Curated annotation (Swiss-Prot):
Residues bearing the modification Phosphoserine: 10, 14
GO cellular component terms, A-Z: axon; centrosome; cytoplasm; cytosol; endomembrane system; membrane; neuromuscular junction; nuclear lamina
Gene field: STX1B
Listed name of the protein: Syntaxin-1B
Native source species: Homo sapiens
Top-level taxon of the source organism: Eukaryota
PTM comment text: Phosphorylated by CK2.
Coiled-coil boundaries: 29-104
Renumbered residue ranges of the record's region Disordered: 1-20
Residue stretches making up the t-SNARE coiled-coil homology domain: 191-253
Medical condition linked: Generalized epilepsy with febrile seizures plus 9: An autosomal dominant neurologic disorder characterized by febrile and/or afebrile seizures manifesting in early childhood. Seizure are variable and include generalized tonic-clonic, atonic, myoclonic, complex partial, and absence types. Most patients have remission of seizures later in childhood with no residual neurologic deficits. Rarely, patients may show mild developmental delay or mild intellectual disabilities.
Organism phylogeny: Eukaryota, Metazoa, Chordata, Craniata, Vertebrata
């Protein structure tokens, strides 16, 4: 009788290896989802901080000379947003590189598709929050600029929008204020506010520059991911046209048929069209 001990031992070793691989993969995905939750939490914090920034902007604009505490709180929020945004960007980049490595090895699995979907979703949410932050900063800059222009008018100095923009870009506030006579308390207050708003704009533009490269990098990533989403949306939009045309053609055809046959034809056509659309959308999503 043939001794199958070695064969059985080899089969057991093979099963053990498969089990180890399976356990390792499960452990890897557990760690991945922990990363996802951490990134999602950071993005939610960013969103909350952006809302706080809006409130601080309103408080600063409401006071001709805002107190130092309010200005410091805004600076702290700005620093926190920068720190959190860089952290999110770094983690998303790490996931992206991991995905690219597996794709380079021509690996395709359900786990990889899940990671790509999660990465795409988180990237989009991140860019949405940072876009809102960028819009908030731009709006604040415009409001500060308007206040400077109004205060210059109080001092008797009229400027065009282009002149004021040139002054802000050069940082040479003295061009407009050196020859203003300090002949009244109102003029002094106006000049103080001009200086305050100008300093706010300088800080703001520094913050915008610091985040610019990161924002462009992530926006380009999301734009490239959007091609797949756009393709799915295109299929869905056109499916509506197909269904509408199918129903219209069916109505014309069944004028000479019984009601029962009319219903049957409409149901068949709609089912076929919807089946094609669903297959197309699912295929596009899974990269088939």
């Amino acid at each position: 009788m043939k001794d199958r001990t070695q064969e059985l031992r080899s089969a057991k070793d093979s099963d053990d290896e498969e089990e180890v691989v399976h356990v390792d993969r499960d452990h890897f995905m557990d760690e991945f989802f922990e990363q996802v939750e951490e990134i999602r939490g950071c993005i939610e914090k960013l969103s909350e901080d952006v809302e706080q920034v809006k409130k601080q902007h309103s408080a600063i604009l409401a006071a001709p000379n805002p107190d130092e505490k309010t200005k410091q709180e805004l600076e702290d929020l700005t620093a926190d947003i920068k720190k959190t945004a860089n952290k999110v960007r770094s983690k998303l980049k790490a996931i992206e590189q991991s995905i690219e490595q597996e794709e380079g090895l021509n690996r395709s699995s359900a786990d990889l598709r899940i990671r790509k979907t999660q990465h795409s979703t988180l990237s989009r949410k991140f860019v949405e929050v940072m876009t809102e932050y960028n819009a908030t900063q731009s709006k604040y800059r415009d409001r500060c600029k308007d206040r400077i222009q109004r205060q210059l008018e109080i001092t008797g100095r009229t400027t065009t929008n282009e002149e004021l923009e040139d002054m802000l870009e050069s940082g040479k506030l003295a061009i407009f204020t050196d020859d203003i006579k300090m002949d009244s308390q109102m003029t002094k207050q106006a000049l103080n506010e001009i200086e305050t708003r100008h300093n706010e704009i300088i800080k703001l533009e520094t913050s915008i520059r610091e985040l610019h490269d990161m924002f462009v990098d992530m926006a380009m990533l999301v734009e490239s991911q959007g091609e797949m989403i756009d393709r799915i949306e295109y299929n869905v939009e056109h499916s509506v046209d197909y269904v509408e045309r199918a129903v219209s053609d069916t109505k014309k055809a069944v004028k000479y048929q019984s009601k029962a046959r009319r219903k049957k034809i409409m149901i068949i056509i709609c089912c076929v069209v919807l089946g094609v659309v669903l297959a197309s959308s699912i295929g596009g999503t899974l990269g088939l």
